[in-house]
Amino acid sequence: MAKFTPASLPAEFLDTMRDIMPSSLSMEDFIAACQRPLRRSIRVNTLKISVDAFLQLAQPYGWQLEPIPWCQEGFWLLNAEEENTRLGNTLEHLSGLFYIQEASSMLPASALFHHNDAPGTILDVAAAPGSKTTQIAARLNNEGAIVANEYSASRVKVLHANISRCGVSNTAITHFDGRVFGAALPEYFDAILLDAPCSGEGVVRKDPAAMSHWSQESITDIAATQRDLILSAFHALKPGGVMIYSTCTLNRQENQQVCRWLQAQFPDACEFESLDDLFAGAERATTEEGFLHVFPQIYDSEGFFVARLRKTGSVPPLPRPGYKVGKFPFSPVAHKDRALLTEAARKQGIRWDEELLQLWQRDSEVWLFPAALTSAFGNIKFSRIGIKLAERFPKGFRWQHEAIVALADPNASNAYALNDRIACEWFQGKDSYPEPLPTADELILTYQNTPVGLAKRISSRIKNSLPRDLVRDGASSARPLAKE
């Protein structure tokens, strides 16, 4: 494991923390926590495997897993520094069975579903790399719909890769400045998660360089952007809907003051909802407003802030955007073709709920779009919607990797379970020569009963068809090496 270099904390930052630190906490503990390495943590992806099944699977690995109190699917991996294998290259991670996610960043999605709220259409304003989007999708069990927005072009590809790896089917990706949604989709979303860009004061344990450009001036600029984002998000939220505002920073200017500013704009339409009962021990981090202000020493985690706001009534709309979205490039698949496509997919072992996902087409491409989002088509431009199911050819369909990962039946007649050795070869982009040979010519490959791809058997060889951008030369099992 790389040597940990503690962060250098600016004196002005420490003075700010000293001024806002609750009397129940000490600066000495705060500084000590900031200068310790961050505990590794993972979240079980219940779209692929149950928590109980994952714990049983992980038993032989020697992992010491401690439950994270605010996320039933989350665990601290206490002996991560003893592991020689990088978690991200394990077969279990590449197969989407778990997501490497910092424990504190699991708080916003947990707060969104507090009191078992199950909103239908959700906006994730700043979604990359996808940890919270995939957590929300798992809580929804791929029902409803999520718009996952990312402003940074370089991070959109990573966002899609993580959504695909985790088998998420109910999500559309957009690439906008988050300030557009209030005008473009007024009062459209049942719930919104705004994990706002921030000064990053809480991440020094993971990124000691995070404080290298810290200044009060930059915080003032960032807070202005946050106010713009939360205002737009509030306009995009339905009356009665819930918004989670979160940051990975600690100062009040980017946290409490942003939330209070929004409430001051709409005193009759914005209420704060307390998170003091979100989990056992939450009161240790709860502010007088009911926000969670998580200093790193409280739970031995990253510093974090989470607020839950309720929109209690309509507000005057923003001016409609002046730009034109352009013609929507997809059209619904005709009824006759739908039946043909659905039957062909089922023969291949691919199934979906036709009430949740609908067939659309563009030229030779066939897609499955979340039904809950159809009213948004034509109002904003999407970078990607749902799942690319197939490409049409004169002699049939070429089924797409992401459709197999999300929708294939691991118990289909053409499914073939990979052992650790062949699964490593698959993710390394290599052909395999398995024994015994599979009988089918076109195979749904599975690992730990989860689909990982589609391949053809050619004589005694499984031809590797994993998309090149998913190949990992270092792919390896988390299982201790043993004879197969």
UniProtKB/Swiss-Prot annotation:
Catalytic center residues: C248 (nucleophile)
Binding-site residues, S-adenosyl-L-methionine: A126, A127, A128, P129, G130, S131, K132, E150, D177, D195
GO molecular function: RNA binding; rRNA (cytosine-C5-)-methyltransferase activity
Enzyme Commission number: 2.1.1.178
GO biological process: rRNA base methylation
Class of enzymatic activity (EC top level): transferase
Database matches in Gene3D superfamilies: 3.10.450.720, Vaccinia Virus protein VP39
InterPro entries for this protein: Methyltr_RsmF_N, MeTrfase_RsmB-F_NOP2_cat, MeTrfase_RsmB-F_NOP2_dom, Nol1_Nop2_Fmu_2, Nop2p, RCMT, rRNA_ssu_MeTfrase_F, RsmB/NOL1/NOP2-like_CS
One cellular component term from this protein's GO annotations in UniProt: cytoplasm
One of the Pfam families matching this protein, by short name: YebU_pre-PUA_dom
Keywords, comma-separated and alphabetical: Cytoplasm, Methyltransferase, RNA-binding, rRNA processing, S-adenosyl-L-methionine, Transferase
Domain of life: Bacteria
Compartment(s): Cytoplasm
Catalytic activity: cytidine(1407) in 16S rRNA + S-adenosyl-L-methionine = 5-methylcytidine(1407) in 16S rRNA + S-adenosyl-L-homocysteine + H(+)
Signal sequence coordinates: none
Role noted for this protein: Specifically methylates the cytosine at position 1407 (m5C1407) of 16S rRNA.
Entry's family note: Belongs to the class I-like SAM-binding methyltransferase superfamily. RsmB/NOP family.
Cross-referenced HAMAP family: 16SrRNA_methyltr_F
Protein name: Ribosomal RNA small subunit methyltransferase F
Species: Pectobacterium atrosepticum (strain SCRI 1043 / ATCC BAA-672)
Source species taxonomy: Bacteria, Pseudomonadati, Pseudomonadota, Gammaproteobacteria, Enterobacterales
